């Protein structure tokens, strides 16, 4: 009996006292049954599950604004994105993409595309970068046509666009990340990695690109030179989300192991880390961070994980 009591006390201490990372100042459960895809902005969260509709949530005050599905299809939403100006959103099933207007929830159009692996939405919400089995396409949503096709040897798994509409960044299963010029569709740089790409990101001003391959180093590149500016964190790391601050001074990253890190771009050094809430403190399993966003004049950070927990952190 005494041994059991000691063991119980030790487990409580382990689950509460040993984690001295800062706690979230706000925690909300958006989906009790978990989520598969998500995107965050300052004011909204767009979430998708493996079946059923996508949900657009207003964050302050919290309210479900829209529930979206692609026509009558019950397939799950595998990717989601909100435009930087918060006027439009896109949702992707495995073989179709839908364009939505946030103000009234209207479905603007649906297109069939096979094997969608990633989606990114331009700041104005009028263009999408869509990862496909052997390329990415830069698609004019308001015109319903492809402007550029960006070739890869294998599936494009992760994509990013800068705020000013100058660059597109694609990461592929072929172990390359490629930077593209959106003024003419030309390839600017091709950056080889040792494994398939897990996450890419671009700063708003287009000065910096982040790339990370599975179980590999995180790199920050200068887009003006194509050279590595800083390498970040441990050498064996897999990111599941990344977002630059609007002033490009910081980048916040999320791991598949349910950890959030804040890095200073100029030094590549870790400034702060957080460990988001687990569903069950007694279980070792962790949820993957799906999306991150700076908020409140960049003084705080939103995060959302596959367990459905939306949390806010003080920077």
Identify what each model region corresponds to.
Residues 2-10, 17-315:
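WD40-repeat beta-propeller superdomains and closely related acidic/aromatic-rich repeat-like regions
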């Amino acid at each position: 009996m005494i041994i059991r009591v000691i063991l119980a006390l030790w487990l409580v201490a382990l689950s509460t006292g040993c984690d001295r990372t800062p706690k979230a100042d706000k925690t909300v459960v958006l989906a009790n049954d978990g989520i598969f895809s998500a995107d965050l902005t300052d004011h909204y969260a767009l979430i998708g599950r493996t079946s059923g509709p996508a949900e657009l949530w207003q964050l302050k005050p919290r309210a479900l604004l829209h529930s979206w599905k692609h026509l009558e299809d019950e397939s799950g939403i595998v990717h989601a994105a909100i435009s930087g100006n918060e006027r439009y959103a896109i949702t992707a099933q495995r073989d179709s993409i839908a364009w939505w207007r946030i103000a009234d929830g209207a479905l603007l159009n649906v297109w069939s595309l096979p094997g969608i692996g990633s989606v990114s939405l331009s700041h104005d919400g009028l263009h999408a970068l869509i990862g496909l089995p052997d390329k990415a396409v830069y698609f004019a949503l308001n015109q319903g046509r492809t402007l550029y096709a960006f070739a890869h040897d294998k599936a494009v798994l992760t994509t990013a666009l800068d705020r000013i509409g100058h660059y597109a960044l694609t990461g592929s299963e072929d172990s390359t990340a490629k930077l593209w010029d959106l003024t003419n569709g030309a390839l600017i740089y091709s950056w080889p990695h040792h494994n398939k790409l897990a996450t890419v990101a671009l700063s708003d001003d287009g000065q910096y690109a982040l790339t990370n391959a599975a179980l590999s180093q995180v790199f920050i590149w200068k887009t003006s030179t194509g050279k590595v500016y800083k390498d970040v964190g441990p050498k064996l790391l897999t990111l599941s989300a990344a977002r630059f601050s609007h002033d490009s001074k910081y980048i916040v990253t999320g791991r598949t192991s349910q950890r959030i890190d804040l890095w200073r771009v100029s030094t590549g050094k870790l400034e702060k880390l957080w460990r988001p809430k687990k569903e069950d403190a007694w279980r070792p399993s962790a949820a993957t961070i799906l999306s991150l966003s700076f908020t409140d004049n960049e003084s705080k950070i939103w995060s959302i994980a596959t367990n459905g927990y939306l949390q806010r952190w003080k920077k």
